[in-house]
Amino acid sequence: MEMDYPLHPPGTLVDTIYDVIKKEIAASHLKPGEKLNSRVLAERYQVSETPIKQALNRLITEGLVESIPRKGMRVRMISWAEIDEILELRLMLDLFFVSDVIKNLRENPELAEQLDNTILCQTACLDLIEDADYYNRTYELDNRFHELYIASSGNSKALEVFHNLNSHVYSSFIYGRQPKEQTLEGIREHQNILGTLVNGDENKAKELITIHISNARNHIYAALKNNDQL
């Protein structure tokens, strides 16, 4: 496969290669367990091996690629047990900070506006983006909503924990890719959650957050099962 790249200012080539490999994994052009040879990839993308190696190391930190001693790198296999644990921690984190988020949204309406704008972008994304670009952009916006939610708690350490978890959540998202109908369902759930937070209904917000995480869990499990990845 030949890739055409525009001229890159210094410092951007690694980012470009990183994005390309990430999209290839999302589109299953690079499959779970597939060996990643830096020389082969350099020829494939018509670049030197240095940015390839740097991009792969970055993907290792995100949980998309793994390095096996004496065997090299490969697209990381992900287990259902790991995904389940991540989602359990996400639920605990989200529920714990509901009251803080409600308080801060009330005191800082611009936070609610940022969350709402993210939902609007998610909706627009459904009509504008296809294939791997669609999956990557959908992930980015979904992640942004949850990131803003945790940030709205005002707890910087909680945000650090979220970011640490999130490096692996991306893996579960792309390996459990979902059709647009399910993505739209998730967007509606975001809308409903935000509505209850703005209205200050703590109990209802907790109920909707629990449903949202549970639905995500079920969708990912079903997708992995259908793809024989369980």
Predicted feature locations:
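Short linear motifs at protein or domain termini
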Residues: 1-103, 225-230
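C-terminal effector-binding regulatory domain of bacterial HTH transcription factors
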Residues: 1-7, 203-230
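Short helix-capping and inter-helix turn/linker motifs at the boundaries of alpha-helical repeat units
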Residues: 12, 183-184
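Acidic/polar helix N-cap motif
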Residues: 79, 199-201
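Short alpha-helical functional segments enriched in proximate histidine and acidic residues
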Residues: 100, 148, 152, 219
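Conserved amphipathic alpha-helical segments that form helical-bundle/coiled-coil interaction surfaces
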Residues: 109-175, 187-195, 204-214
